[in-house]
């Protein structure tokens, strides 16, 4: 990862701290993964604070595949089956069946409807009957152990929410360029600068979590 591009956002630990502060304040963050992995950047918001306006931005600026990152416990609570039994995707991205709120939505595809669906899924007493299947929100099951067990955007999202003291659920979508191609690190930096969003990498988060583990040992 080209650290010089990220230098304006501080060192790795400072970048994570800035992201946590932004999430606590209800703002978005941008997370890049390794250049030898997907080499993509995701726009991420906390599920519990995400607004209709933020969802509209995500739909407008990103790929359109809006994903709700959930813990394994929440996936079980909602009785969400995995999208396929045998996952043959390259990075084993753990999609469940897609969802829609059972109440309060129309077609399910608008920004407001997707927020309604997300709120139904993350409610404290959420139950399977609160959701219809399929729908326009794509849940992802995070692996237990977070980025220390899998260096994916799903795990990074849940880790960030937990470290920020928020509900362990986040919303992500891959940032794209105007021509529809995937945004790379220079594009993330420019987008973060324009929208005053922190930019960090999954490697930053791995280092941060490892440091916390060492301090508590």
UniProtKB/Swiss-Prot annotation:
<comment type="subunit">
    <text>Homodimer.</text>
</comment>
<dbReference type="GO" id="GO:0008686">
    <property type="term" value="F:3,4-dihydroxy-2-butanone-4-phosphate synthase activity"/>
</dbReference>
<dbReference type="InterPro" id="IPR000422">
    <property type="entry name" value="DHBP_synthase_RibB"/>
</dbReference>
<feature type="site" description="Essential for catalytic activity">
    <location>
        <position position="174"/>
    </location>
</feature>
<feature type="binding site">
    <location>
        <position position="174"/>
    </location>
    <ligand>
        <name>D-ribulose 5-phosphate</name>
    </ligand>
</feature>
<comment type="similarity">
    <text>Belongs to the DHBP synthase family.</text>
</comment>
<feature type="site" description="Essential for catalytic activity">
    <location>
        <position position="136"/>
    </location>
</feature>
<keyword id="KW-0460">Magnesium</keyword>
<keyword id="KW-0456">Lyase</keyword>
<dbReference type="Pfam" id="PF00926">
    <property type="entry name" value="DHBP_synthase"/>
</dbReference>
<comment type="function">
    <text>Catalyzes the conversion of D-ribulose 5-phosphate to formate and 3,4-dihydroxy-2-butanone 4-phosphate.</text>
</comment>
<feature type="binding site">
    <location>
        <begin position="150"/>
        <end position="154"/>
    </location>
    <ligand>
        <name>D-ribulose 5-phosphate</name>
    </ligand>
</feature>
<feature type="binding site">
    <location>
        <position position="38"/>
    </location>
    <ligand>
        <name>Mg(2+) 1</name>
    </ligand>
</feature>
<dbReference type="GO" id="GO:0030145">
    <property type="term" value="F:manganese ion binding"/>
</dbReference>
<keyword id="KW-0464">Manganese</keyword>
<feature type="binding site">
    <location>
        <position position="38"/>
    </location>
    <ligand>
        <name>Mg(2+) 2</name>
    </ligand>
</feature>
<keyword id="KW-0479">Metal-binding</keyword>
<feature type="binding site">
    <location>
        <position position="42"/>
    </location>
    <ligand>
        <name>D-ribulose 5-phosphate</name>
    </ligand>
</feature>
<dbReference type="GO" id="GO:0009231">
    <property type="term" value="P:riboflavin biosynthetic process"/>
</dbReference>
<feature type="binding site">
    <location>
        <position position="153"/>
    </location>
    <ligand>
        <name>Mg(2+) 2</name>
    </ligand>
</feature>
<feature type="binding site">
    <location>
        <begin position="37"/>
        <end position="38"/>
    </location>
    <ligand>
        <name>D-ribulose 5-phosphate</name>
    </ligand>
</feature>
<comment type="pathway">
    <text>Cofactor biosynthesis; riboflavin biosynthesis; 2-hydroxy-3-oxobutyl phosphate from D-ribulose 5-phosphate: step 1/1.</text>
</comment>
<dbReference type="GO" id="GO:0000287">
    <property type="term" value="F:magnesium ion binding"/>
</dbReference>
<dbReference type="GO" id="GO:0005829">
    <property type="term" value="C:cytosol"/>
</dbReference>
<keyword id="KW-0686">Riboflavin biosynthesis</keyword>
<dbReference type="InterPro" id="IPR017945">
    <property type="entry name" value="DHBP_synth_RibB-like_a/b_dom"/>
</dbReference>
<protein>
    <recommendedName>
        <fullName>3,4-dihydroxy-2-butanone 4-phosphate synthase</fullName>
        <ecNumber>4.1.99.12</ecNumber>
    </recommendedName>
</protein>
